[in-house]
Amino acid sequence: MARKSSLLKRAAIAVVSVIAIYVILNASVSRSLPSSSDLPRQLIREDDDDEGRAPIQPRVRVYMYNLPKRFTYGLIEQHSIARGGIKKPVGDVTTLKYPGHQHMHEWYLFSDLNQPEVDRSGSPIVRVSDPADADLFYVPVFSSLSLIVNAGRPVEAGSGYSDEKMQEGLVEWLEGQEWWRRNAGRDHVIPAGDPNALYRILDRVKNAVLLVSDFGRLRPDQGSFVKDVVIPYSHRVNLFNGEIGVEDRNTLLFFMGNRYRKDGGKVRDLLFQVLEKEDDVTIKHGTQSRENRRAATKGMHTSKFCLNPAGDTPSACRLFDSIVSLCVPLIVSDSIELPFEDVIDYRKFSIFVEANAALQPGFLVQMLRKIKTKKILEYQREMKSVRRYFDYDNPNGAVKEIWRQVSHKLPLIKLMSNRDRRLVLRNLTEPNCSCLCTNQTGLITSI
């Protein structure tokens, strides 16, 4: 009995000893490890205290120049004077309303940055008041409006408004700014939506991020996918508020616009010749006017497909009119560039046809008549899901998406700015543009 008691005592002592050793070692190791508050933030799992939430990305800081009024509101005044809206300059030009036209992005971006930050929820950028804090600089010139101040109106020599003088004045003003000179304009953003906007000074502002409709009038060393942002035109027809369906869309194919265009737009006249005698096809010549916009709205809202040929350059506002009308775009423009293609697959709601094929008699209408109602409804659903991207009035629409695209340019801007400071001499035989090139020169087709 005594022997058994002795064994139990020794076993108990051994267990207590093991427990004591474990406690001592555990305390020692714990003291040698940092707590979670001592670890760098990037080493702590995000979902430990906020499961499921994506890391918050810092907003890009944008400084908007307070340009002289002659580059902003003064252009609204000049436009109104040229059309008899006002007889003489007004005391406060900021009370004037920006006129409606297809390149209104410049007004919407300007207005967005003038809003209080509390009204800009969800924007990928934040406006800063000190240029020293800025990542990017926005130049809010109304360059597209400047082009149409005297559109279709004769101007006597030495009098009236001059778009060329405005451009020269703008670039001289910019080149006088410390922040422009610092990086040769690379970290500046300039709206140039009309293909002819700023044409006189492009070589002096080509380092900047240009907001463009396409690259039809730009040389490779002036504009590129990597450096610049392709933006949508402002739609000129009313948004279609009905449901998807084809019951009230009795026209197969609709087009209303200028029949005669230059360059790639010459395809329009040829399409007229091919299509104007086809049944259930409406194709009309028409220029910009309120009456024609009403007719175009009705036509697009009652058609299954809308023809989108090239204009003077590969792009045209009609594509965006088609999308907001839920009228399936039929695109005949071999070199067209499209906005926001990193988030939008246009093939899901558009039909692309190579120009030579489209000009074959009967080809287009036969192809369209073979498309089943089910497929048209799929196109319409997809258009309805993405059309906010092309609506400048939508709080989560075009303006926010343009700023997102602009913010993505920042890493390249920093790279190129640092690289330019480093390189002293470059022996180049061709222009060095920061462009994304393809080794394919022909048309790329897919079935």
Swiss-Prot record:
Which InterPro entries is this protein grouped with?
A: Exostosin, Exostosin_GT47
Q: Name one GO cellular component term.
A: endosome
Q: Does the keyword Membrane apply?
A: yes
Q: What happens when the gene is disrupted?
A: No visible phenotype under normal growth conditions, but mutant plants have strong reduction of arabinose content in leaves and stems due to a decreased content of pectic arabinan.
- Give me any GO biological process, just one: protein glycosylation
Location of the protein in the cell: Golgi apparatus membrane
Q: Which GO terms describe its molecular function?
A: glycosyltransferase activity
What is the first-listed, main subcellular location in coarse terms?
Golgi
* Family annotation (Pfam families): Exostosin_GT47 (PF03016)
Q: Enumerate the glycosylated residues.
A: N427, N432, N439
Enumerate the Lumenal topological stretches: 30-447
Its tissue distribution reads: Expressed in root vasculature, cotyledons, leaves, stems, vascular tissue of sepals, petals and stamens, pollen grains, mature siliques and abscission region of seeds.
Locate the region Disordered. Answer: 32-52
Membrane-crossing ranges are 7-29
Q: Which UniProt keywords apply?
A: Cell wall biogenesis/degradation, Glycoprotein, Glycosyltransferase, Golgi apparatus, Membrane, Signal-anchor, Transferase, Transmembrane, Transmembrane helix
Enzyme nomenclature, EC number: 2.4.2.-
Annotated membrane topology: Single-pass type II membrane protein
Bias (Low complexity): 32-41
Topology, Cytoplasmic side: 1-6
Q: Briefly, what is this protein's role?
A: Probable arabinosyl transferase responsible for the polymerization of arabinose into the arabinan of arabinogalactan. May function as inverting enzyme using UDP-beta-L-arabinopyranoside. May be important for arabinan side chains of rhamnogalacturonan I (RG-I), a major component of pectins. Cell wall pectic arabinans are involved in thigmomorphogenesis response of inflorescence stems to mechanical stress.
Q: How does it assemble?
A: Homodimer and heterodimer with ARAD2.
Family as reported in the entry's similarity comment? Belongs to the glycosyltransferase 47 family.
Q: What is this protein called?
A: Probable arabinosyltransferase ARAD1
Print the organism lineage.
Eukaryota, Viridiplantae, Streptophyta, Embryophyta, Tracheophyta
